[in-house]
Structure formats: C-alpha cells, structure tokens
C-alpha cells in the first residue's frame, strides 16, 4: 500500500505542477501588463482601446496586417576613470511605430512623441498602402502570456547613486590590488529599462518589460616603457545586485590577466615562409586566402568566364 500511495502522490504532483506553473506565469503576465499599461499607456493619456480604434481606422483599407508598437526607454550610465566618476547621464526616450502590410508592400510610420494624435496621424499615413472601401471593425483587445524569461524590476532603481559609484570604485580597488603593474582603471556601468506594448489588427495585444545592465572594465598595465590594455565585463537582463562581489572579481581578474598577457606578447611571425597544407579542409583555406584574390584579378582584367 505504501508503494501505491507514493505512486499516487507522484502522479498527482505531475498533474498539479503544470497548473501551478501556468498560474505563476499568469500572475507575472498580469503584473507586467498592469505596469506597462500604467507607466507607458496611461501616463501618456492612452489605453488599449485607443490603439484598437487606430488599428480599426487602418482596417478600413485593404491591408493584410497592421500593428502598433509603443516603447519607452529609460537609460542611465556612469563612467569612472583615474579614480573619479568623470561622466554620468540619464535619459528617457519614447515613441510609437505603426506598420501596415498589403500584399508584398509594407508601410511604416513613426513618431518620437507618444500620444493619441501621433498614433492617429501615423495610422492615417500607413493605411494608404491599401485601397479604401472596407467596413471598420473595432476588435476587443485580448492579451496572451508566455513563459517569463527574465525579471522585470527596474535596475535603475535597484541601487542608489552612492552604491553605483561605490561599485565602480570597488572595481578600481580590485584591479590595482591584483598586480602593481596596473596603472589605470576605467569602469562603466549602464542600466536600461524598456516598457513595450504591441497591438495588432487581429485584436491581439502584448506587453513586455525588458531590464538590461552591463558592467564594462578596461585596465592598462605598464612594464618599463610598454603599456598594454585588457578588458572584460558582462551583464544581462537583471537588476544591479546581480553584480556580486564574486562576479565583479571575476571580471576584474579577466581584464587584468588579459593586460598582463599582452605585456608578454611577441609579434607574430610575418613575411615569406613555407606553408604545408594537408588534404581536405586546408584546401578551403587556400581557396579563401588566394582563390578570391585571383577571381578578383580575372574580373578586373575581364578575363573571367
């Protein structure tokens, strides 16, 4: 009985787990949708129904497909050099793009402003790709959700300015402590936060939030009169706490190692030399290295068949 009971529990678990996963994706989708509708659409006096009405106006012409793409991007960057933060910037860009397809023809229109008037005028511009004469239909917006592949927190707000500057100073400290030959450190930290809303002619709507962070490190090593550079870094769709002390140390060590290796590097052999190629793929190398040049000469001299 014990074995049977355990089997039943496993079977029930296999049935319930997909439902739990689906519910989790549904909740994340709802959170994303609400955030994008509030901070992208409503903040600019728009609603999903407004986009559907503009698409309906496009649909009065003979078009096969149309969509409206709304986007807002917030970007922040910090740059450290010579022990101090020498530059920092913050900007917000937003706009809308409208597309219509009729047969093999595609029309685009876009605006740097995001409001009902710019969307209406863009829709009127692209719909001329198709002939007029269809009856207008306003489709009720319906959203679909898929698997969440990254988190949606705003990385710009995940650390305050002092913590971001401290992270860059930490990079410099680690690099100079790694080897006394490191004489200069340059580090950059960038954060991006995209809000996206897409509406299609068939009534399908979709929302997405795309965070992006990157830490870039460049070091200069000096030995005698020779100076060499090394660089490393990384990032992804995370918030800034992703850059743990362990990960930052790995980036720094990679940049330092590259610079120190370059200090010991010698020029590669150059000039005329004998090269022996075996059969098979080396023949391809020979063709790429020599054959294309010969083909070009033949074409230039108009002697090619």
Regions found by a protein language model. Name each.
Residues 15, 20, 24-305:
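Active-site bordering "gate/hinge" segments
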Residues 2-6, 11-12, 22:
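Acidic, Ala/Val/Gly-enriched low-complexity intrinsically disordered segments
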């Amino acid at each position: 009985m014990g074995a049977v009971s355990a089997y039943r529990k496993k079977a029930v678990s296999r049935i319930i787990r997909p439902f739990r996963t689906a519910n989790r994706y549904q909740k994340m989708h709802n959170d994303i949708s609400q955030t994008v509708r509030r901070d992208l659409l409503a903040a600019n006096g728009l609603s999903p129904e407004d986009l559907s009405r503009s698409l309906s106006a496009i649909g009065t012409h003979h078009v096969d497909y149309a969509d409206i793409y709304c986007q807002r991007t917030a970007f922040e960057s910090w740059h450290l050099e010579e022990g101090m933060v020498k530059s920092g910037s913050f900007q917000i860009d937003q706009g809308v793009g409208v597309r219509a397809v009729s047969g093999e023809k595609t029309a685009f229109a876009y605006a740097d402003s995001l409001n009902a008037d710019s969307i209406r005028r863009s829709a009127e511009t692209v719909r001329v790709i198709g002939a007029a004469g269809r009856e207008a239909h306003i489709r009720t917006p319906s959203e679909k959700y898929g698997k969440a592949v990254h988190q949606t927190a705003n990385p710009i707000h995940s650390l305050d300015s002092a913590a971001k500057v401290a992270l860059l100073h930490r990079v410099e400290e680690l690099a100079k402590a790694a080897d006394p030959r490191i004489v200069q450190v340059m580090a950059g930290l960038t954060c991006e936060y995209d809000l996206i809303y897409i509406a299609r002619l068939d009534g399908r709507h979709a929302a997405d939030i795309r965070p992006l962070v990157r830490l870039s490190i460049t070091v200069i090593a000096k030995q005698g009169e020779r100076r060499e550079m090394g660089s490393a870094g990384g990032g992804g769709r995370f918030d800034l706490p992703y850059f743990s002390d362990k990960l930052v140390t790995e980036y720094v060590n990679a940049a330092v190692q590259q610079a120190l290796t370059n200090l010991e590097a010698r020029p590669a052999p150059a000039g005329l030399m004998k090269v022996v190629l075996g059969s098979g793929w080396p023949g391809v190398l020979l063709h790429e290295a020599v054959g294309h040049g010969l083909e070009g000469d033949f074409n230039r001299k108009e002697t090619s068949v």
